[in-house]
Regions:
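Active-site alpha/beta core segments
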Residues: 1-72
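Short hydrophobic alpha-helical module
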Residues: 33-37, 79, 83, 112
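Short coil/turn connectors at secondary-structure junctions
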Residues: 57-60, 83-86, 112
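Active-site acidic carboxylates
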Residues: 1-17, 78, 86-89, 97-98, ...
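Short glycine/serine/threonine-rich phosphate/pyrophosphate-binding segments
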Residues: 69-76, 83
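Fold-independent oxyanion-binding glycine-rich loops
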Residues: 17-18, 67, 91-93, 119-120
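Short, solvent-exposed polar/charged micro-motifs at secondary-structure junctions
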Residues: 25-27, 126-129
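Short gly/pro/ser/thr-enriched loop/turn and capping motifs at secondary-structure boundaries
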Residues: 21-23, 71, 94-99, 123-125
């Protein structure tokens, strides 16, 4: 359904959904960067001056977590994988009504190609090095 007005005001962009999968509401298109326009009229240039056709866009990486790992998160992640995204599921930031449901969702997601990660794994991968300007701040949050 609709997002809470107070939360919506804090966000640049929001997605209201009624389907269990947010991809059904256009999440994949929303996350994909816009295509870059081609410059000039290629037919007007000699072949040796024409720009090569753009390579296929790199697979975007989506980091996902949520409350109902076995319902909305599962269906959204599976649809994003089908839509050619690389999906990282932050397992320690996911829940379900029961551990069995959560673990079954993780098993299914791993089998479909999702990367199962933890909050710390994501944080340190994004930092890349202890020389990152935010390293000490992140370390303080984790400890």
């Amino acid at each position: 359904g609709a997002n809470d007005a107070a939360l919506r005001a804090l966000c640049h962009k929001t997605l209201a959904k009624m389907h269990f999968s947010a991809a059904e509401e256009g999440l994949g298109e929303w996350l994909r960067p816009p295509a870059k326009p081609q410059g000039g009229n290629a037919r007007s240039l000699p072949k040796h001056l024409q720009k090569p056709a753009p390579l296929a866009a790199e697979r975007g990486t989506i980091v996902i977590a949520g409350c109902e790992a076995h319902v909305c998160l599962l269906q959204t992640a599976l649809d994003l994988i089908d839509d050619e995204f690389e999906v990282w599921v932050v397992t320690d930031a996911c829940g379900s009504r029961t551990e069995r449901n959560r673990d079954a969702a993780f098993d299914r997601l791993a089998g479909a190609g999702a990367e199962l990660v933890t909050t710390e794994m994501v944080a340190f991968e994004w930092l890349g090095s202890c020389e990152h300007p935010a390293f000490k701040d992140v370390l303080g949050l984790i400890k």
